UniProtKB/Swiss-Prot annotation:
Organism ancestry: Eukaryota, Fungi, Dikarya, Basidiomycota, Agaricomycotina
The protein, known as: Ribosome biogenesis protein ERB1
Gene designation: ERB1
Record Pfam families: BOP1NT (PF08145), WD40 (PF00400)
Native source organism of the sequence: Cryptococcus neoformans var. neoformans serotype D (strain JEC21 / ATCC MYA-565)
Region of interest (Disordered), ranges: 1-142
Locations listed in the record: Nucleus, Nucleolus; Nucleus, Nucleoplasm
Length: 830
């Protein structure tokens, strides 16, 4: 309730008059007269208090005159005060009458103690007996007044039987339930509304401003004003909400009351406020954003012409400051000493906070040792482990029968189809306890880590300019008519001629130096699959492969006479023997391969340099010569068990080294110094001993499909290319797996080749590039081969997804010859 207004009574005013003689006089008399009239009316209404008679008023007036004579020094001050207050007397009387009306209204509507009641309780007997004060002189009155105000008040004052002095007629008195013989006053209930000062709106849930999540696990949501639980209202699911939004039009104008946990309908006024906020307007409908401007200080007749201060400017405004000069000199000294750097570029702040930075880590103590890390979880600890990790019934029984110290694990793996179905781990507390024991009881040791520079682990490769010479540019181009695809290319052992086989069925011989075509053979048997020069320098033999036929050729007019004679003797000797025929020679050595026929070409073809035809099953795709130049092997993947054939030119004999092929043979090669034979299938490379007729070893390529193969001149290293864009280097003294697997081409590799004498090798791919590498093979078995990338040669065009098809090194020179699907053969020189 609002505090009750206090009304000054007569008794208290008399005390004020006695205790403050300086304010005596006319002003005091006016105050006494005004208050006495009000107090008399109030005392009359209450039926209590002290009434003053006319005689007492006259006595008071006499006392005042005596006081004026006794204290003449106050007269002048009182007269001045009377003059100053005379003008305010009328206003004071009017204010006093207004206050009396307000006091009367408040006294009718409120109960409790009045000021007059309080003063009456604390009034002394001397104040009530005015008869005794009449005869006392002024000095005695002053002495009593001083003595009264210097004595401790009596504690027993106000302890009378009447506890409540509320006005009669307000409320009703009922016997007290707690104190016998006492009464308490009951009042009517007051309904609080919007006009009330204590409450604005009744809310049945009185929990206050707390998170309602605290009641999520309880059936109720709070308590009412009487302490009873407010149970949670029924909540519909998402389907109910959807139906309410569809069927109930009022659902769109309701909001959820989080305190009551139910939807409350918004009033029209609240909806209007929401609409205004959505339109970015003022929520008050009566607000006028375009009201006229009120010119408080700039309107007509309201200009400020007088300055706020007309004091003259001080001298310090025109004299340089001494203290600023000292501060500036300190800054100048700091700049000269370098402690302050002017125009220092500000350090760029990081855009993102470095959460992994070690800058904020403190240096640990010298004796600090970090705790060992927990081992990472294993597959058996998964909530959904594979079936092989789940124990059987026998294993479960065996595990349960074992002691805890003998068990390998403290748990049995279990399988759950969802993480939410995994129960609590019962050994969690025990494991954490044992972890804590290990942390503060188990001794720790510090392991010294090897400080190895990562750069030292990377091999230091020499610069490419130190490994010259190697091919770097295209110097000569050998263009084929019609841009026909050139599938194969080969160089003569003397390095003077280049042979190429194209899809138009023509074998061409080119001059290496000037790029002129000097010889050609049209075999009329379809595309030329492969061409290969014999490695023997004493002869000039060229083998070309077409569908179902092998052609042994020689450009006799281009070579020296003694070389031409040796070539003819070597190729035609078997025809001169008695066992030789025009269809098949050395028939005793061709057991099981009657389909292979050595035939002699016509006279006209022999004049053009066609020496021998060999009819073979299937379509041979690759040919390779033995280092002596008498044997050569062919591969026809579509010939089943006769896919690999080894032919002897001097005896016109052919034989199949395999009774049953170990897969689809892709490439074959002779060992450069031993009677060994390499056969590459799609994924494996097998090494055979031809003399002992046995398998020596099998190399695992690690690729999906081998496309090409070449053997190093030393015989202990091998490279292969694959259609899955990989090149693998094998060190057969090291392992059966690749020593290096390189993937640098963007498309399939078509050909790889070692240089016969120099430490170089190259690879060709369908991406139209040729990569040149330096390779040094050391005689020391403890040292690995050195591989250094040197150059990427670009020049061939990619036609229908096919780029460079074949490449060969020029013997004795760091030059490379390549052929592509664009109908060009290019010579790359250093």
């Amino acid at each position: 309730m609002a505090p009750q207004p206090l009304k000054v009574g007569t008794s208290k005013l008399s005390k004020m008059v006695k205790s403050a003689p300086k304010t005596a006089g006319k002003a005091k008399k006016r105050a006494v007269e005004q208050v006495s009239e009000e107090s008399d009316e109030e005392f009359g209404d209450q039926g209590s208090g002290i009434d003053m008679s006319d005689d007492e008023e006259e006595v008071d007036g006499d006392d005042e005159e005596d006081e004026d004579e006794a204290f003449p020094e106050f007269d002048s001050e009182l007269e001045d005060n009377d003059q100053e207050e005379a003008s305010d007397e009328e206003q004071d009387e009017q204010d006093t009458s207004d206050e009396s009306e307000i006091v009367e209204e408040d006294s009718d509507s409120e109960s409790g103690y009045n000021t007059s009641d309080i003063e009456r309780m604390y009034a002394s007997d001397d104040d009530l007996s005015s008869e005794e004060n009449k005869d006392l002189p002024v000095d005695e009155k002053l002495s009593r007044l001083i003595a009264k105000n210097t004595v401790k008040p009596d504690d027993s004052i106000g302890t009378d039987d009447k506890i409540s002095r509320a006005k009669e007629g307000v409320g009703r008195l009922v016997p007290s339930k707690h104190v016998k013989g006492s009464f308490v006053r009951e009042y009517d209930e007051y309904e609080a509304g919007y006009g009330s000062e204590s409450s604005t709106e009744d809310n049945p849930n009185t929990v206050g401003n707390i998170p309602m999540e605290w009641y999520d696990d309880l059936p109720h949501i709070g308590y009412d004003v009487n302490g009873r639980k407010i149970f949670r209202p029924l909540q519909g699911d998402e389907l109910d909400k959807f139906l309410a939004n569809v069927e109930d039009p009022s659902a769109w104008t309701s909001a959820e009351d989080k305190l009551l946990q139910q939807n409350v309908q918004l009033s029209d006024k609240e909806l209007d406020i929401i609409r205004r906020l959505e339109r970015a307007e003022n929520p008050d409908a009566d607000f006028d954003p375009y009201q006229p401007t009120i010119e408080w200080f700039t309107g007509e007749g309201k200009e400020r012409v007088m300055p706020l201060s007309a004091a003259p400017e001080p001298k310090r405004r025109f004299v340089p400051s001494k203290w600023e000069h000292k501060k500036i000199m300190k800054i100048v000294k700091a700049i000269r000493e370098g402690r302050i750097i002017p125009n220092k570029p500000s350090a760029e702040k990081p855009r993102f906070y470095p959460i992994w930075s070690d800058a904020d880590q403190h240096n640990p103590h010298v004796m600090y040792m970090p705790a060992p890390q927990l081992p990472p979880p294993k597959t058996a600890e998964s909530y959904n482990p594979p079936e092989e990790y789940l124990p059987t019934e026998e294993e479960k029984a065996e595990w349960e029968a074992m002691d805890k110290e003998d068990r390998k694990t403290d748990f049995l793996p279990e399988k759950y189809d969802a993480l939410r179905k995994v129960p609590g781990y019962k050994n969690l507390v025990q494991e954490k306890f044992e972890r804590c024991l290990d942390l503060y009881l188990a001794p720790r040791t510090r392991r010294v880590k090897l400080n190895i520079d990562p750069d030292s682990l990377i091999p230091k490769l020499p610069a490419p300019k130190e490994l010259k010479p190697f091919p770097i540019a295209s110097t000569v181009q050998y263009r084929h008519p019609g841009d026909t695809r050139v599938r194969s290319v080969s160089t003569s052992p003397d390095g003077q001629w280049i042979a190429s086989g194209s899809e138009d069925g023509v074998v061409r011989v080119w001059d290496l130096g000037n790029g002129r075509e000097v010889w050609r053979w049209d075999l009329h048997a379809g595309p030329i699959q492969y061409v290969e020069w014999s490695p023997s320098r004493e002869e000039s033999l060229l083998v070309a492969l077409v569908a179902g036929k092998i052609a042994v050729l020689s450009p006799l007019a281009l070579v020296a006479p003694h070389i031409a004679a040796q070539t003819l003797t070597h190729s035609n000797t078997a025809f001169a023997t008695s066992s030789a025929t025009t269809k098949q020679g050395a028939g005793n050595e061709v057991k099981g391969i009657e389909s292979v026929k050595w035939t002699r070409p016509s006279e006209r073809e022999r004049e053009r340099g066609v020496l021998v035809y060999v009819e073979v099953p299937g379509t041979p795709k690759q040919v390779t010569w033995h280092r002596k130049g008498d044997y050569f092997a062919t591969v026809a993947s579509d010939a089943a068990n006769k896919s690999v054939l080894i032919h002897q030119l001097s005896r016109h004999g052919s034989q199949s080294p395999f009774r049953k092929t170990p897969g689809t043979i892709q490439r074959v090669a002779f060992h450069p110094s031993k009677p060994h034979f390499f056969a590459a299938t799609q994924r494996y490379i097998r090494l055979y001993d031809l003399a002992a007729q046995k398998l020596i070893r099998t190399l695992q390529s690690g690729v999906k499909w081998i496309s090409s193969m070449d053997v190093h001149s030393g015989g202990d290293n091998l490279i292969i290319g694959s259609y899955d864009k990989k090149l693998a280097w094998f060190d057969m003294d090291l392992s059966a797996k690749p020593y290096k697997t390189l993937r640098y081409h963007n498309r399939a590799l078509r050909s790889v080749a070692y240089h016969p004498t120099l430490p170089l090798f190259a690879s060709a791919s369908d991406d139209g590039t040729v990569h040149i590498f330096h390779c040094t093979v050391y005689t020391d078995l403890m040292q690995n081969p050195l591989i250094v990338p040197l150059k990427i040669l670009r020049g061939h065009k990619v036609i229908d997804g096919i780029g460079v098809l074949d490449l060969r090194w020029v013997p004795g020179k760091p030059w490379l010859v390549s052929s592509g699907a664009d109908g060009e053969v290019r010579l790359w020189c250093s």
